[in-house]
Each structure stands twice: as C-alpha cells, then as structure tokens.
Amino acid sequence: MDFITINSSNKTEEFALKQVVKQATSSLLYRLGKTIILASVCVEREPVSEDFLPLVVQFLEKSYAAGKIPGGFVKREGRAQDFEILTSRLIDRTLRPLFPKDYRYPTQITLMVLSHDIENDLQVSALNAASAALFLAHIAPIKSVSACRIARIGNEFIINPNTSLLNQSSLDLFVSGTKESLNMIEMRSLGQQLNALEEPLMLKALELAQKSLKETCTLYEEVFTPHQNELLFKESQGIIFNERLLDLLKNQYFDEIIKGIESSALSERENVFNEIAKKISEAHSEFSLEEIEWSLEKVKKTEIRRMIIQDKIRPDKRALEEVRPILIESDLLPMAHSSILFTRGQTQSLVVGVLGTDNDAQTHESLEHKAPIKERFMFHYNFPPFCVGEASSIGAASRRELGHGNLAKRALETSIKNKEQVIRLVSEILESNGSSSMASVCAGSLALYASGVEIHDLVAGVAMGMVSEGQDHAILSDISGLEDAEGDMDFKIAGNLEGITAMQMDTKMSGIQLEILYQALLQAKEARKHILKIMHEAKEKIVINFSHLPTTEIFNVAPDKIVEIIGQGGRVIKEIVEKFEVKIDLNKPSGEVKIMGNKERVLKTKEFILNYLHSLDQELEQYAIDEVLEAQVKRIVDFGAFLSLPKGGEGLLRKQNMDRCQVVLKEGDSIRCRVISFNKGKIALDLA
C-alpha cells in the first residue's frame, strides 16, 4: 500500500493507493479530515462500435457515512438522490473533455462516500478523488484535473471554504480544470438579497480559482506520475477520410449541404442529410453508407466553423452577437397560479407556477446536512421527446432534466424576497433548438412575478457558445442546437442588469482560457440587457389575479387548543379541509395555525375555527367541579369511555375508574357521573 499526503489550497488531502478494490483498473481511498471517499476506475478491454464516449460516472452517498439509518419505510439506500445525480454530472462534465476523441472503451468511475464530516466539501473532494483515480489508471493520455470552490464574505474571496463559511457567503463558485485552463464552472449567488456578481469581480474570482487549480494539478502530476499504471490505450490517428469522397461532396453536393445547415429544426436538418447520404450511396456504390455519413458530418462541421470564424455569420444568418426573436405570452392556463410562454427562435418554454404550504415543501435527506431539509422553492424542467420531433414515450426525469432544472432554480432563488414561501415552477419545453434551460429561466422569472411572489428583480438567461480554430475564435450569443453541437463551448449565464446570479460552463476542448471566458461574460451582458428589456415590457402587461391566487392567514391559539382543531383521529381537521377546500398547517408547540387557499375561503376557515374553539370553551363553562350529571356513553376506547354530557360537549371516564367500580359499559348506556377536573380543555369524569 502507498500512502500520499498533499497540502494545497487550504486543505490537506490523503490518498491510500492499492489498499482496497484491487481488481479494478485503479482505486484509492481519499481522505480529507473525517471525510473518506472510495474512488475506483474500471475499464473494459473491448471497444464499442458506436460513435460516443462510453463513460459513466456514479457518485453514491451511504447513510452510515454520517452515522445515520436511511429514513422511510425501507431502511436501505435506493434510488439516487438529486444531490448524488448532480454531483455525478459535475464530475462527468469535468472529465469527459479530457478523453481522446476516438476513445471507445467502456469506462466506469465510481465514487462512494464511506465517511463524511459536514464541514467538508463533498463535491470538491469527490472530483479530486475521481481525477486522481483516473490519472493513476493511465487508460489514455489524460491530464490531471482538480476542483476548488470560491466563496465571498463581504469583499473577500475565500478558497475552499468549509460549510460554515459557505453559509455566510454571497457567492458559491465551483471551478474545475487543468493547470493550464478551465474545464467546467458552476456558479450561483447566495443570501437574502439578489447578490448578483459583476463581471470584473467574476473574473477576479475565476483568476483566483485558476491559480488554485494550477497549484493542485501540478502537485498531483508530480506525486501521482510514479504510481501510474502502464498506458493502456494510445491515442489513434482517428478516422481516415476518403479524399475522393470529400471532393465529391464539396463539388457536387455542396449546395444541398448548405441547405441542410440552414435548416433550423433538428428533424428537418436530419432529413436533409439522410436524403443526401441516400442519394450518394445509390449513385456511388464504391462508398459505404457509414463512410458517406462520416464524410458528410466532417464537411458540415468544417463549413459551419468556417462560416462563423471567417465570414462572421451563423447558420441561421444571424450576426455573432444577435439574439433570436423573442415572444412572451402570459396567463394561458386559467387554473394555474401563473403561466408564461417564452419563445426565443425555435425554443419554447411554458413555465407554470403554483404556490403551496409548508406541507408541500420537498423533504431531502443528504450527508451535507445533519437533519432532513425542506426545499421550499422547486424548479422542475421537463424535456419531452416531441419538442425535437422524436417519436418516443415520456419517462422519468433524466439526469439532464434534473441538471437543467437545478440550474434554473439556482438562477432565480435569490431573486425571491420571502424565502419561506413554498413555490413550484415547472418548465415544459414545447419546442427546442438550443438554450432551453435559459428560456426556462426567463419564463420562470416572469412566472414568479405573475404568481404574486415578491422578487428583487427580473432575471434573464442566455447561452453563449464559442468556435475556435488555431489562434482564431468567435463568441456566439444565444446559441442554437446546431451551434451547440458543432461548437466548442456551452456557457449558460443568468442574471439581471447589474450582474450574474448563476452560470454553468461546459467545454468539448481540454480547457478554455480566462481571456475568452471574460469576453463571453461581457458579450452575455449585452445579450441579457436586450432580453431583460423585452421581459420588462412583458411584465408591464401582466395582470396579477390576486383573487385567484392563494393567500395565507396566520394566527395563534392556545397551544392546548391545537388538539381540539385536529380532533379524534384527525376527524375535525379533515372535515374543515374538505368543507372549505383549504390547506392547514398546525404547530403544536407554538399554537400557530396557518391556513392557505382562496382568500374568501381562508377567512371563512379562520372564522369557523375560532368560533368552534369558542363554543368548546362555552361548553366547559357550563359545568362545575363535583357537579353530578346523567351522561350517555358515546364511544368506548382502550383507555376508557367518552360520554355525551346533557348541556353539550363530552367528557372522558377513564378505564381505571370503571375497573375500580367493576362497571362494564356499552355504547348508548346512560350513567350517573361526576365532574372531577378540567384539563387542557377536556372534562374528566368519575362514576357518581
């Protein structure tokens, strides 16, 4: 066993090599304080024939890692939690660009949390553990990467804060990359205010992150290189194209290829290129269909990139900084609390808003928190197949859908003034040609306003792209699906006029320089201004229907009266909820009653509850201690009998009093009894 300790970027990491999981291609135990993560890499020796990178990253939390037993009926870890899925995506998006383009060997990277101290950053630790395990596996010429998190408290940036410091921060910036460049970025603003970060300050934070990554990656390479396995798979020369076929495509079919490039819809574009491939295959049998499709793809990609870099024009004829036409419609769904249809080019998001009560909040268990937490603001993103013209059924939410919903939530969360409000936004993507997550942000911000939710400001989102050839590059605003597929970067940025509230950057290159990222940030700001202007114009036309929106009424009663509102077996509260069609939250220790629903019904419910409690008090006032009554047995329970009293109300005759007098009662019997006490609104009886 080899044991390695690395000190960098405000933390001490320990790596135990060759101790466990020895049948994997590589494995290690990562330790940061009391946090221990098992990282393993397994590679199959037979490549797949499909044209994709067969990489799977799985991050798993174990409840025992925090000394817990899983909640719920089944005491075993089951379906992956959102945090596990989002962390898996975070690691995947960092590592995927590092692999050679023609790497086709199925590879599984597994991160299993065995022990965790909530003060440590699980995502940074997991990515660093995965990076080290992959570097040691040496399955291909892959650079070392690392991650860091940047917080901002006051005007000071902090590298790799612990959880306590992050909770005080106005910024949560997660960055990963090599010692030369950045691979992946996740950012969100934090706090009670909007806390949008200005572009120059964002650049300063990214520079600090780059410095930290350079230090850590340099140490990783120095320390881990002597422990690497032998290189398993060398990078090949890639696909060898038939020059005669390429010339044929450029000379005889170029106009048709351009027509396909200019087709805005994915399904339409695929049909055009399928027809071209079929036509060539029939006319030139010496070329295989696969060979033709590969060559078509190469000519298409080369021409798109040439148009953008040399001609400064895009496939849909837009200028590089131009945003597609925007149309915003509101109040489409009469029964929802809000609905906004946001259309940008051929991307369309319908965001529906619904307000709820505390009982509607989503409860999560995670190693990141000591106790289950309540998620009060939910953003759910759905990408049905029909939005891109695909004929397939709708299933459970995919990793991508969870990721896009989380990004939109992060963009909008700090814009909400009242963080205690329970809000669910759902984005239904009805049509997609790129930037659907950013369309969801724009529609979501307006949906919050239309729901009567108080917000600090509107938030808009735009997806930026980049095409790079040698020393030349071009930054694109509001990228389409084709530009996303053929470009080198997908940089989603959301914010208001002052700054950024959330961003996410992925790249297909081995990394991107800070100068290019800053150029993209400034260009995105101009695009955001344009979008926000249209959104503010749409906001002025929104009429909030307050009579339809749910209202919340909060009042207090004596804590011992809460049981009266609940009733035996919940009978009373069920009747109230069914009668008035409202939602009720009760707090037993404080006596707080929270009613939510239609304003008129809420007020009637409050009046009913107060009158009901008053009537119970009046019933008690009619009786005196030691008063003898003729009562009737209403119902028999394990601990005694409830008796209907002659002047209204009921009292409890306990079982021990019945046993003492050797009395056997049945429902409907009449019996003489005596009032012995009043306890928390209840009348206690004894046999007279």
Swiss-Prot record:
Catalytic activity field: RNA(n+1) + phosphate = RNA(n) + a ribonucleoside 5'-diphosphate
Top-rank taxon, per record: Bacteria
Annotated GO biological process: mRNA catabolic process; RNA processing
Occurrences of domain KH (ranges): 550-609
InterPro entries: ExoRNase_PH_dom1, ExoRNase_PH_dom2, ExoRNase_PH_dom2_sf, KH_dom, KH_dom_type_1, KH_dom_type_1_sf, NA-bd_OB-fold, PNPase
Annotated binding of Mg(2+), by residue: D484, D490
Record flagged with keyword Disulfide bond: no
Subcellular location: Cytoplasm
HAMAP family given in the database record: PNPase
Protein's recorded name: Polyribonucleotide nucleotidyltransferase
Lineage: Bacteria, Pseudomonadati, Campylobacterota, Epsilonproteobacteria, Campylobacterales
